[in-house]
């Protein structure tokens, strides 16, 4: 671990203590996990405290951990992952918070901490259904207004629930149930006579 990351790691442990559920170093970056109840105050401190100085939030996304690693995942299903940058200290940090309720996943909004979180939180809401408590304009940003469900959830059907098409009789775009019929793909192997070792005699 570099001296810079060692300093950041010590600062995090000293300042937050038990609020850190985990602190891991991988690929030259530190990832911390905090509880949903502590998320907002931790994020505010990461921006405001001189020991951290994370003035930029560079990314925020949702994650669906169901069947994580194709094993039996015992943890919570939905998480929010935030990437922070301190230009002054030249270090980065990844913060992960799990939503406690799988039926209605929600965490605090950090739009009052970093205004740039606004559309990122709307995207995570739209694609994963994670609600951000305190967000003043939490509405869909990528899918259509009448879209049903959240398409990045692992249990969302690949073909979706409805499809849109233009109806010339009604002279407008309409929604209808998906008409794609499931099919089985048969793998085909096409080999030329000159393929592989047989081409060299």
Curated annotation (Swiss-Prot):
Its Enzyme Commission number(s) read: 7.1.1.-
Keywords of the record, alphabetical order, are: Cell inner membrane, Cell membrane, Membrane, NAD, Quinone, Translocase, Transport, Ubiquinone
| Major subcellular location class | membrane
Under Pfam families, the record lists: Complex1_30kDa
Q: Cross-referenced PROSITE patterns, in alphabetical order?
A: COMPLEX1_30K
Domain of life per record:
Bacteria
Membrane topology per the record?
Answer: Peripheral membrane protein
Query: Which GO CC annotations does the UniProt entry carry?
Result: plasma membrane
Q: What class of enzyme is it?
A: translocase
UniProt entry tagged with the keyword NAD: yes
Q: Where in the cell is it found?
A: Cell inner membrane
This enzyme catalyses: a quinone + NADH + 5 H(+)(in) = a quinol + NAD(+) + 4 H(+)(out)
Single GO term (MF): quinone binding
InterPro entries membership: NADH_DH_suC, NADH_quin_OxRdtase_su_C/D-like, NADH_UbQ_OxRdtase_30kDa_su, NADH_UbQ_OxRdtase_CS
Function in brief: NDH-1 shuttles electrons from NADH, via FMN and iron-sulfur (Fe-S) centers, to quinones in the respiratory chain. The immediate electron acceptor for the enzyme in this species is believed to be ubiquinone. Couples the redox reaction to proton translocation (for every two electrons transferred, four hydrogen ions are translocated across the cytoplasmic membrane), and thus conserves the redox energy in a proton gradient.
Assembly with partners or alone: NDH-1 is composed of 14 different subunits. Subunits NuoB, C, D, E, F, and G constitute the peripheral sector of the complex.
The protein, known as: NADH-quinone oxidoreductase subunit C
Native species of this protein? Answer: Dechloromonas aromatica (strain RCB)
